[in-house]
A protein has these predicted regions:
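Mixed-charge (Asp/Glu-Lys/Arg
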Residues: 1-127, 132-156
Length: 156
């Protein structure tokens, strides 16, 4: 599971008050309220890239494939807009990353980060749960290291 540092762009995430559903049920809504800042955008881009491949593996993997880091990322890791399913995969990935960041850095949930890492193809979205977020209500609680649960939906 990847551990993420808080990206600078999350300071742009603001809550919108007064949003209600058609039955007058209040909704928790958030939006990006941003000012163009290249340093923050660069930090955000790096944050997104780290969802796919950790820094410690990137240079080694590129070298093993006899590619520059940029070539390796484009050819094998990051969905590209000119490829079949590339735009859809990019859009889905960024949406999942945005929601994971909202849950982790704004709402203070624990969010495992592994969906984009080691998937079967850069333009293929893995099937299953998009985001898992959890929180312990008692201070100092942690999951037992010898206990894990797996839930799987099966047909028929």
């Amino acid at each position: 599971m990847l551990s993420m540092d808080r990206p600078q762009y999350v300071n742009w995430i603001v809550r919108e008050d007064g949003v209600v559903f058609e039955d007058q049920q209040p909704l928790n809504c958030y939006r990006l309220s941003y000012v163009r800042d290249d340093a923050i955008l660069d930090d955000w881009a790096l944050h997104i890239r780290k969802q796919y491949v950790p820094d410690g593996e990137l240079e080694e993997d590129a070298a093993l494939n006899k590619l520059t880091v940029e070539e390796y990322l484009r050819q094998y890791i990051i969905p590209q807009k000119g490829e079949p399913f590339g735009p859809t995969a990019r859009s889905n990935d960024i949406s999942e990353i945005l929601f994971a960041d909202l849950f982790e850095f704004i709402l203070n949930y624990e969010v495992p980060r592994c969906k984009q890492h080691n998937r079967s193809g850069k333009n293929e979205s893995e099937h299953g749960t998009d985001i898992i977020a959890y929180r312990f209500f008692a201070e100092g609680k942690a999951p037992h290291k010898k206990c894990s649960y797996r839930f799987k939906k099966r047909r028929g």
